C-alpha cells in the first residue's frame, strides 16, 4: 500500500497514515488555508446547523442500511476506485486531498452529529435502520476519528484508464461497514479529475498548434500558458 501524497498547492500539508492508531490524519492547518471551504451557514433543516460538516449525512441514504447486508463474520472491506474509460486515452488524478482534509481528517464523528443524523434518517425510514451504536463505537473507541486507511496514486499523475487510483480499507474489524459508507463522498473527486483531464488535453492542443504555426519561444511558458481560458472551475 502506498502513501497519500500532497496536492501541489502552497501551505497544504502531507496527509499521513497514523500507523499506531490506524486513523486518517493530517497536520494542523488553519481555516484560512482551506480551499473551497464554502459558507459555514449552509444547513439542511437542522436546528444545530451542522449541515455539510456532518459526515454521517454525506452519503446515499441506502448506504445507511448496508451494515445489515454484509455476510456474518465480515471483518475487512477493501474497495478501490478506478476510471473505466472516457473520451481521452488517459486521465489526470486530482482533487482527493481536498476531500480528505475537508471532510475526513481529525475528529469528524461526535455525539451531536450522531443526534442530527438520527433525527434525519428516522424521518426517512424506521429508526431501527440507523446504526447509532456503530457510530458511538467510533466516538468511544477512536475519539471520533475514522478507522480507515486510504491510499492513492500521487495527485496530478496522468495514467491510462482502468488503473486503481485509490483504495479504502477499514482498520478496525468492527467498522467493516464504514469503507463503502464513504463512497458517495469520495467519488466526488470525479469533478476535479474531469476538469484536470480536459484542461490538460486542451493545453496540449494549444501548445501543438503554436508549435506548428508560429515562431513563439515555446521554452518560455508565458508565451502559451495564458491561451486557455478554463471556465470549468
Label every model-predicted segment:
Residues 2, 37-38:
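Residue-identity detector for glycine
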Residues 4, 8, 12, 46-75, ...:
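Buried, small/hydrophobic-residue-enriched core segments of structured protein domains
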Residues 11-13, 19, 24, 30, ...:
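Intrinsic disorder/low-complexity segments
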Residues 108-168:
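Glycine-rich, N-terminal phosphate-binding loop and its surrounding beta-alpha-beta segment
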Amino acid at each position: 500500500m502506498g502513501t497519500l501524497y500532497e496536492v501541489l498547492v502552497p501551505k497544504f500539508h502531507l496527509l499521513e497514515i497514523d500507523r499506531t492508531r490506524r486513523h486518517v490524519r493530517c497536520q494542523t492547518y488553519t481555516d484560512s488555508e482551506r480551499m473551497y471551504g464554502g459558507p459555514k451557514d449552509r444547513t439542511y433543516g437542522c436546528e444545530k446547523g451542522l449541515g455539510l460538516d456532518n459526515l454521517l449525512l454525506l452519503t446515499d441514504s441506502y448506504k445507511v442500511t448496508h451494515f445489515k447486508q454484509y455476510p456474518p463474520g465480515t471483518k475487512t472491506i477493501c474497495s478501490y476506485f478506478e476510471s473505466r474509460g472516457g473520451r481521452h486515452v488517459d486521465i489526470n488524478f486530482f482533487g482527493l486531498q481536498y476531500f480528505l482534509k475537508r471532510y475526513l481528517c481529525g475528529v469528524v464523528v461526535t455525539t451531536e452529529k450522531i443526534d442530527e443524523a438520527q433525527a434525519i434518517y428516522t424521518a426517512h425510514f424506521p429508526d431501527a435502520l440507523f446504526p447509532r451504536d456503530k457510530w458511538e463505537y467510533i466516538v468511544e473507541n477512536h475519539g471520533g476519528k475514522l478507522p480507515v486507511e486510504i491510499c492513492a496514486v500521487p495527485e496530478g499523475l496522468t495514467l491510462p484508464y482502468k488503473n486503481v487510483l485509490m483504495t479504502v480499507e477499514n482498520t478496525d474489524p468492527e467498522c467493516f461497514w464504514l469503507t463503502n459508507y464513504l463512497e458517495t463522498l469520495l467519488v466526488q473527486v470525479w469533478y476535479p479529475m474531469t476538469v484536470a483531464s480536459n484542461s490538460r488535453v486542451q493545453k496540449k492542443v494549444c501548445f501543438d498548434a503554436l508549435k506548428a504555426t508560429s515562431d513563439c519561444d515555446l521554452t518560455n511558458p508565458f508565451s502559451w500558458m495564458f491561451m486557455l481560458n478554463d471556465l470549468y472551475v
